[in-house]
């Protein structure tokens, strides 16, 4: 499981012209792009949620748990794209939807159980993600 985390001052996910999840402007939060591979499980999702919730990448070396920063979770199978051969990525390392969707949901639910305010994109949908990266700070978490 890979989580590409971006510190943001605002972000939103749009599906079919509708905003389905957002971090309001001028609110420091985290955008978590979540990729799932074949051997991931519920424990990895939980451990990564705990790691993200306590990761000190916000202002003044604070974590989301320290300041109650909102987290926007968006599924992102392309995090497992392989570009070593040719000019077209392959997605073989990405878990199929029936495997990945419940694990992305478990990740978001684990964050909520830790006390996070979580919004999400729509799994498998064509999404437009808008964000204002703060810093910029971008970190890759992986287990």
UniProtKB/Swiss-Prot annotation:
It comes from the Bacteria. One of its GO terms (cellular component) is cytoplasm. It holds the Pfam family Tyr_Deacylase. The keyword Cytoplasm applies. The keyword Hydrolase applies. SUPFAM superfamilies: DTD-like. Keywords: Cytoplasm, Hydrolase, RNA-binding, tRNA-binding. A motif (Gly-cisPro motif, important for rejection of L-amino acids) lies at residues 135-136. Homodimer. HAMAP family: Deacylase_Dtd. A Gly-cisPro motif from one monomer fits into the active site of the other monomer to allow specific chiral rejection of L-amino acids. This is D-aminoacyl-tRNA deacylase.
């Amino acid at each position: 499981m890979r989580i590409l985390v971006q510190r943001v001052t605002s972000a939103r996910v749009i599906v079919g012209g509708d905003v389905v999840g957002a971090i309001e402007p001028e609110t420091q939060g985290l955008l978590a792009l979540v990729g799932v591979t074949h051997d991931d499980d519920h424990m990895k999702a939980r451990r990564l949620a705990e790691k993200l919730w306590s990761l000190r990448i916000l202002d003044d070396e604070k974590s989301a748990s320290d300041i109650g920063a909102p987290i926007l979770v968006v599924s992102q199978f392309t995090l497992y794209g392989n570009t070593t051969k040719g000019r077209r990525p392959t997605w073989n390392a990405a878990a199929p939807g029936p495997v990945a969707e419940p694990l992305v949901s478990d990740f978001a639910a684990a964050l909520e159980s830790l006390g996070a305010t979580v919004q999400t994109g729509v799994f498998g949908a064509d999404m437009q993600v808008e964000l204002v990266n703060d810093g910029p700070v971008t970190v890759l978490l992986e287990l």
